Amino acid sequence: MRWPGNMEKIVICLMVIFSGTVAHKSSFQGQDRLLIRLRQLIDTVDQLKNYVHDLDPELLPAPEDVQRHCEQSAFSCFQKVELKSANTGDNEKIINVLIKQLKRKLPPTNAGRRQKHGLTCPTCDSYEKKPIKEFLERLKSLIQKMIHQHLS
């Protein structure tokens, strides 16, 4: 007669373990989405570097040496910039797809929510304007910094 009681305990233990695993995984899911998105952005920037000569040569505000906790703000400055294809050649469609990928919002994070409270970050207009190649290098550097901070 004791067997059903033990079986119930085992089933309950397994359910607790399973639900704890699911809860643990879902709490990290948003973080994983951010990391995946940031790594995709690195690839996108690298691809855009191949088309530097096909982009409008306009000088663009490019954040550098971004203060800690101002990364999201600086990233949004990069996203607000109007990157444009310089010609209507074969590469225009590819460039436009890459630019759209850069403009997609990042998944929400706790750090992003904290940043909105009480921290004063530089405005987009305050950043020095740079040629497109340096703009892309600084964007990549910022994304790498965001990945590093996310992992630490």
UniProtKB/Swiss-Prot annotation:
One of its GO terms (molecular function) is cytokine receptor binding. InterPro entries: 4_helix_cytokine-like_core, IL-15/IL-21_fam. Residues 1-23 form the signal peptide. It is found in: Secreted. It comes from the Eukaryota. One of its GO terms (biological process) is T follicular helper cell differentiation. Disulfide bonds join 70-121, 77-124. Keywords: Cytokine, Disulfide bond, Secreted, Signal. GO terms for cellular component: extracellular space. The keyword Signal applies. Pfam families: IL15 (PF02372). Its main location: secreted. Belongs to the IL-15/IL-21 family. Cytokine with immunoregulatory activity. May promote the transition between innate and adaptive immunity. Induces the production of IgG(1) and IgG(3) in B-cells. Implicated in the generation and maintenance of T follicular helper (Tfh) cells and the formation of germinal-centers. Together with IL6, control the early generation of Tfh cells and are critical for an effective antibody response to acute viral infection. May play a role in proliferation and maturation of natural killer (NK) cells in synergy with IL15. This is Interleukin-21. The lineage of its organism: Eukaryota, Metazoa, Chordata, Craniata, Vertebrata. The gene is IL21.
